[in-house]
């Protein structure tokens, strides 16, 4: 069975589930060892699961079979949003340069080549994917060979580097090894992965020799479009509020866990959350309402993991809606509304406690209403971080009151990332955000 290394705020819940699904847990933290009574195993993982930057999900990376199996079991349990890269990290292929800074990868997809590399249009060479394509973003490939193993990575950069998870004391041992037993490989290009700190010199030397033989074989090339070596599969997994509640249940089977634990952990709560768990206090709604005061950051998370942050000040809290005032940077035009963003233009954002939408209404510096933008998303999570997953379709209303549906084609393009329950998003029409909350009447001005 596959070996999994799991880190982050979802570690206990996902470790419990992974064990149920037959995974072996490797390189566990001491806390996970204690909670599950595990025997420490420091062998390299087949899959690594770690926090996404938004703390509203995880990133999975590893051998494709292990990643696919983990995603399928996770899909069955929590029904999350899943975006899997269409190419692997360190896929090695024969690419044809088709334009300035672009190379054609297997399947015809185009990837960007960093400007520091000089490539001639029409030429072919061996390329390695260093940033896989995700959602609307192109991948990045370089005219280098990268051959990654469990412990090491051989490459053609001519440098020796180390995972940031290897401490300086351990780096000293590996640096000496790179200058002696691995000297020939280090002169080509060598990177020590985090698992290298647990490996013996003989294990490292054996893998380096195997990777070198594979690199020689790859360097012989092939016809354009050939995939010479499969890299690691990567996927972004995002949890909405419903999915987080399911993960709360999984964690509760191991240690005391209140409803809303993972949502609150994503707000940055530490020891005080441990206390609430121990006391068994059902305080999620009150806690997030308390946290949503003063300055907040709205995390607008795209299904493929892109995070757009909007900062503002809470001007009103009621039982069912939060009102945030956000200054806008001058310049440009409000999409779907047509009004110019002048100095002093601001938005009032209404965040309902339930309902799959957020309402952004826009005002001039003097408080004159300009129009409204309704974002359709998962149920928002309150707190000092207001978090939701964008479901890609939006509505806009100008001063004429005409409803304009935006980005419906984007939903169609990326619907496969969404679970079935989220593929037909709806939002009420005619909603406007004012300093007092949601209304359907056109305001003449606002003093917020």
Swiss-Prot record:
Function summary: Probable RNase involved in rRNA stability through maturation and/or degradation of precursor rRNAs. Binds to RNA in loop regions with AU-rich sequences.
Keywords: Endonuclease, Hydrolase, Nuclease, RNA-binding, rRNA processing
Gene name, Swiss-Prot/TrEMBL: fau-1
InterPro entries, per database record: DUF402 (IPR007295), FomD-like_sf (IPR035930), Ntdp-like (IPR050212), RNA-bd_FAU-1 (IPR016730)
Polar residues bias spans: 436-448
EC id: 3.1.26.-
Family the entry assigns: Belongs to the FAU-1 family.
The protein's name: Probable ribonuclease FAU-1
GO MF entries: mRNA 3'-UTR AU-rich region binding; RNA endonuclease activity, producing 5'-phosphomonoesters
Region of interest called Disordered, as start-end residue ranges on this chain: 426-448
Biological processes annotated in GO: rRNA processing
UniProt source species: Pyrobaculum islandicum (strain DSM 4184 / JCM 9189 / GEO3)
Signal peptide limits: none
PANTHER family: PTHR39159, UPF0374 PROTEIN YGAC
């Amino acid at each position: 069975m596959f070996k999994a290394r799991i880190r982050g705020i979802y570690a206990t819940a996902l470790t419990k589930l992974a064990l149920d699904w037959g995974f072996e847990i490797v390189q566990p933290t001491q806390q996970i060892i204690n909670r599950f009574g595990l025997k420490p195993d420091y062998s390299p993982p087949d899959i690594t699961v770690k926090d996404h930057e938004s703390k509203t999900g995880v990133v999975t990376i590893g051998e494709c079979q292990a990643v696919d199996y983990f995603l399928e079991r996770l899909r069955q349990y929590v029904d999350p949003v899943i975006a899997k890269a269409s190419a692997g990290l360190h896929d090695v292929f024969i690419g044809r340069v088709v334009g300035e800074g672009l190379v054609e990868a297997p399947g015809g997809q185009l990837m960007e080549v960093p400007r520091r590399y000089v490539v001639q249009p029409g030429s072919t060479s061996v390329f390695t994917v260093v940033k896989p394509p995700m959602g609307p973003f192109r991948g990045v490939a370089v005219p280098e060979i990268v051959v990654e193993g469990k412990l090491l990575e051989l490459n053609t950069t001519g440098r020796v580097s180390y995972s940031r998870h290897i401490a300086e004391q351990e780096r000293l041992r590996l640096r000496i090894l790179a200058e002696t037993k691995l000297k020939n490989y280090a002169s080509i290009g060598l990177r020590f992965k985090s698992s290298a700190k647990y490996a013996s010199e003989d294990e490292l030397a054996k893998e380096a020799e195997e990777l070198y033989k594979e690199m020689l074989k790859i360097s012989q090339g092939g016809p354009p479009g050939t995939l010479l070596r499969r890299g690691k599969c990567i996927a972004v997994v995002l949890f909405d509020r419903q999915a987080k509640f399911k993960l709360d249940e999984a964690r509760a089977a191991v240690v005391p866990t209140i409803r809303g634990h993972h949502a609150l952990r994503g707000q940055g709560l530490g020891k005080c959350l441990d206390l609430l768990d121990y006391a068994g206090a059902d305080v999620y709604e009150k806690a997030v309402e308390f946290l949503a005061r003063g300055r907040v950051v709205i995390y607008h998370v795209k299904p493929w993991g892109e995070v757009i942050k909007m900062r503002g000040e809470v001007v009103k809290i009621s039982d069912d809606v939060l009102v945030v005032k956000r200054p806008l940077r001058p310049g440009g035009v409000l999409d779907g509304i047509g009004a110019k963003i002048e100095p002093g233009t601001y938005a009032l954002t209404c965040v309902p406690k339930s309902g799959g939408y957020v309402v952004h209404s826009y005002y001039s510096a003097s408080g004159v209403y300009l129009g409204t933008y309704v974002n359709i998303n998962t149920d928002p999570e309150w707190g000092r971080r207001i978090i939701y997953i964008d479901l890609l379709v939006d509505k806009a209303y100008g001063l004429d009151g005409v409803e304009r549906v935006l980005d419906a084609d984007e939903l169609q393009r990326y619907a496969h990332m969404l679970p079935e329950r989220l593929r037909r998003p709806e939002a009420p029409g005619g909603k406007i955000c004012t300093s007092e909350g949601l209304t359907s009447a056109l305001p003449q001005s606002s003093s917020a």
